């Protein structure tokens, strides 16, 4: 992988991890169009660019993450007070909701890991799923503006949506934000929850891929990996702020049009 290919794919990863247009879908299509060997690119490169997106979340949400860790530690130190903390502390409750989303996502990954990995080899299937993401985004225009809060049930349903986004072409941020909005969760709350709940998922995936990488060895040049990581980090920070602004304004349909365009072109040309 050349440095400019690493730069391009790093930018794609950072932008599309948070902008609701499917990072996995764009990496599949990008690697296909660049003629990269998927087996060599995925294991090595994805570990590093996902680390870049982890740093993006930590940079933007450092105060929130620090509070979540503090509340989790307090809960572990005083388990008998957990019900009270859950009822009275918004941050502690948010942490519990994030844990709830991991249940359906983890189950889906364990049960369907093999077919999911096979799906990453089909650019046409990925293109079709991008069109599906566009439909999800467009449906947010229906109905009144949401103004509610999260609950345990809503968080679980959002987790189910996140598990569906394991399929390449289905945007994780798009599926989770839209599902929260469909359940009358206020837009900014929905977007912030979507980004915070991504952190343990990406960390877990990075660790698993990292272990695989240790067995296989680094397949790409160190310079290219560094460039890709920095590109993913910088573009990821910008993408988070862009999405927060778009969600506040209720304009997710613009991303839907983009998904229709890219997905349609993929179905036509690939």
Curated annotation (Swiss-Prot):
Primary location: membrane
Superkingdom of the source species: Bacteria
Gene Ontology BP terms: cell wall organization; peptidoglycan biosynthetic process; regulation of cell shape; response to antibiotic
Keywords, alphabetical: Antibiotic resistance, Cell inner membrane, Cell membrane, Cell shape, Cell wall biogenesis/degradation, Hydrolase, Membrane, Peptidoglycan synthesis, Transmembrane, Transmembrane helix
Pfam family name, one: BacA
MF (Gene Ontology): undecaprenyl-diphosphatase activity
Annotated compartments: Cell inner membrane
A single cellular component GO annotation: plasma membrane
Keyword match Cell inner membrane: yes
UniProt topology in membrane: Multi-pass membrane protein
Catalytic activity: di-trans,octa-cis-undecaprenyl diphosphate + H2O = di-trans,octa-cis-undecaprenyl phosphate + phosphate + H(+)
Family designation: Belongs to the UppP family.
Note: Bacitracin is thought to be involved in the inhibition of peptidoglycan synthesis by sequestering undecaprenyl diphosphate, thereby reducing the pool of lipid carrier available.
Role this protein plays: Catalyzes the dephosphorylation of undecaprenyl diphosphate (UPP). Confers resistance to bacitracin.
Name of the protein in its database record: Undecaprenyl-diphosphatase
Provenance organism: Salinibacter ruber (strain DSM 13855 / M31)
């Amino acid at each position: 992988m050349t440095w400019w290919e690493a730069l391009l794919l790093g930018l794609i990863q950072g932008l599309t991890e948070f902008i609701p247009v499917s990072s996995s879908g764009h990496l599949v299509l990008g690697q296909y169009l660049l003629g990269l060997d998927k087996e060599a690119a995925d294991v090595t490169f994805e570990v590093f660019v996902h680390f870049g997106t982890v740093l993006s979340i930590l940079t933007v949400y450092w105060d929130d993450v620090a509070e979540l860790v503090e509340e989790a530690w307090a809960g572990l130190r005083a388990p008998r007070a957990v019900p009270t903390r859950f009822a009275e502390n918004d941050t502690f409750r948010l942490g519990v909701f994030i844990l709830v989303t991991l249940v359906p996502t983890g189950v889906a990954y364990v049960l369907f890991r093999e077919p999911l990995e096979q799906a990453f080899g089909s650019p046409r299937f990925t293109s079709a799923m991008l069109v599906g993401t566009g439909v999800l985004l467009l449906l947010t225009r229906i109905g009144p503006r949401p103004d509610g809060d999260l609950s345990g049930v809503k968080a679980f349903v959002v987790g189910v949506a996140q598990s569906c986004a394991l399929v390449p072409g289905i945007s994780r941020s798009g599926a989770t934000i839209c599902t929260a909005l469909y359940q009358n969760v206020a837009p900014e709350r929905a977007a912030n929850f979507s980004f915070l709940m991504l952190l343990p998922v990406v960390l877990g995936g990075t660790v698993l891929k990292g272990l695989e990488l240790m067995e296989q060895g680094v397949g790409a040049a160190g310079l290219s990996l560094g460039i890709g990581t920095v590109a993913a980090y910088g573009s990821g920070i910008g993408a988070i702020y862009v999405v927060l602004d778009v969600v506040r304004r209720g304009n997710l349909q613009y991303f839907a049009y983009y998904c229709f365009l890219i997905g349609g072109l993929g179905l036509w040309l690939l």
